[in-house]
């Protein structure tokens, strides 16, 4: 435990092996918070006849050029203000979230929209680790609208 704690505080370790210093609790945190809350909300809504469609979370990457990687690492350190978060760790956390959401959709029979498979890129698409530029928000909306139409719904464009 002491060695892992030391690694979490090491900038060299974060830059060279970021996934090895991501806290082991990340998967459990994803299951306990967003996935569990969405499961509860979705079940309540479904019990009232609401059809459920869940879209994945997009994140920068999967491959970034050096300048984008520097920007997203800086952004992670500046905004998250902890010793283990950088672009690779944030990307892994989003991947864990998407895995949890997709699994939830399959187990509950809900429609899954993997927007993260379509929305990729660097600073031309993402303002930071979490937020899209306006053109990418429209892109995401089109992906969701297409999924709604494919599910038998309607979408106004």
Q: Model-derived features: where do they sit?
A:
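Histidine-centered active-site loop/cap adjacent to the catalytic His
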Residues: 34, 111, 125-157
């Amino acid at each position: 435990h002491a060695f892992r704690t030391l690694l979490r505080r090491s900038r060299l370790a974060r830059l060279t092996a970021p996934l090895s210093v991501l806290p082991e609790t990340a998967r459990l945190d994803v299951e306990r918070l967003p996935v569990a809350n969405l499961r509860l909300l979705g079940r309540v809504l479904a019990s009232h006849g609401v059809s459920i469609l869940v879209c994945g979370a997009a994140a920068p990457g999967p491959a970034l050029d050096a300048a984008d990687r520097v920007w997203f690492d800086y952004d992670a350190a500046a905004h998250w203000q902890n010793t283990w978060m950088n672009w690779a760790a944030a990307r892994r956390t989003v991947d864990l979230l998407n895995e949890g959401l997709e699994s939830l959709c399959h187990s509950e029979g809900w429609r899954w929209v993997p927007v993260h498979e379509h929305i990729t890129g660097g600073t031309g698409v993402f303002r930071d680790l979490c937020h899209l530029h306006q053109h990418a928000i429209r892109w995401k909306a089109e992906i969701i609208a297409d999924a709604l139409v494919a599910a038998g719904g309607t979408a106004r464009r």
